Curated annotation (Swiss-Prot):
It is found in: Cytoplasm; Cell inner membrane. Pfam families: DUF489. This is High frequency lysogenization protein HflD homolog. The lineage of its organism: Bacteria, Pseudomonadati, Pseudomonadota, Gammaproteobacteria, Pasteurellales. It comes from Haemophilus ducreyi (strain 35000HP / ATCC 700724). SUPFAM superfamilies: YcfC-like. The keyword Cell membrane applies. Belongs to the HflD family. GO terms for cellular component: cytoplasm; plasma membrane. Keywords: Cell inner membrane, Cell membrane, Cytoplasm, Membrane. It is a peripheral membrane protein.
Length: 215
């Protein structure tokens, strides 16, 4: 079966977007609310009709991730952000471990179903502080124990704040979800060695399509 680099790039952009959000929350204490919202919403899309449907069928919801993909795959004028690189590599590793652990996968599905039920208590606002805290708890209790803990670097003033910790962990959870998607559509670590240009070019094409549609 031919490798579908469109789907692989969409899923990888989801991973990179989560990694970028982690970096922004840890260093600035804030991130784009719309980007964070669309990233978190992807956690509750369990039966998508397409890969892009995980992000509400709109490539605009992945522009931050697509920009990061281009930088990570060779479009950053030689200035590779190794911190973001470390995040997405670790997110991928956790998603691969999750995929091989049926007990953890079952627990994750059940906990996300609980989140869906809880939404009605918060006017269906997935950005409600308690919902983000609950998603963070899922990451801490189910995902984090699967592998080495991801060391998040940033400003101590932000890193010690519970609300920032929750947003970071919720972002990591969404990244792991994108990592599962990446595996489902044929993503492979070998592609980062032998197909970097294909991934870069596809991300660039998606980004141009977004720019043209927003003009």
């Amino acid at each position: 079966m031919a490798t579908d680099y469109q789907d692989i790039t969409i899923a990888f952009a989801g991973i990179c977007q989560a990694a970028t959000l982690v970096q922004q929350f840890a260093n600035k204490g804030v991130a784009d609310r719309a980007v964070f919202s669309s990233t978190i919403k992807s956690l509750l899309v369990t039966q998508p009709q397409s890969t892009l449907a995980v992000y509400d069928g709109n490539i605009a919801h992945l522009t931050m991730g697509l920009a990061t993909v281009q930088a990570q795959m060779g479009g950053g004028n030689g200035k590779l952000d190794t911190e973001i690189g470390r995040y997405w590599i670790n997110i991928l590793a956790l998603s691969q471990k999750l995929n091989k652990d049926p007990v953890a996968k079952s627990q994750l599905i059940q906990r996300l179903k609980q989140i869906e039920r809880q939404l009605s208590l918060y006017d269906n606002d997935i950005m409600a502080d308690q919902i983000i805290a609950n998603l963070a708890a899922i990451y801490s209790e189910i995902i984090s124990p699967l592998g080495s803990k991801i060391q998040v670097l940033g400003l101590q003033d932000y890193l010690v704040r519970p609300d920032i910790q929750h947003k970071v962990r919720a972002s990591l959870l969404a990244g792991v979800r994108a990592g599962i998607l990446w595996q489902q559509v044929g993503g492979s670590r070998w592609q980062f060695l032998f197909s970097r240009k294909k991934i870069f070019n596809q991300a660039k094409l998606f980004y141009k399509d977004f720019e043209l549609s927003s003009d």
